[in-house]
């Protein structure tokens, strides 16, 4: 029920360091907490947004390498929650697809190995079956607040 930006509450969810960007010793940080946003809804929203903003950083890193990303495939238990896929779409600023449960990580690893072994040839494609698609208006201000906090804490 919380609004985008969790009423000014931002979380860097670095509970075990962070991989994107590579900060293995980083720690988690809640920023902007006050009496108005220290409620379960805003805390949950900040946690979801923080986790997803880490994925936005990964997408941005790929784009900086010249990879064109038009949509995002969201997998895992949390992806089944329509609120999370909607928040993800607004943070990514692009379509989010949620397939039926499957072994997508193992399949992706096998496809990547096949691609590497075949010298860059196109790996076999997988039919995702029935897919739920979500596309929401972007919320760049949430990503901006996350990145500001991330950058401010780089040397912690």
Locate predicted features.
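Glycine/Thr-rich phosphate-binding loops that ligate phosphate moieties of nucleotide
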Residues: 1-156
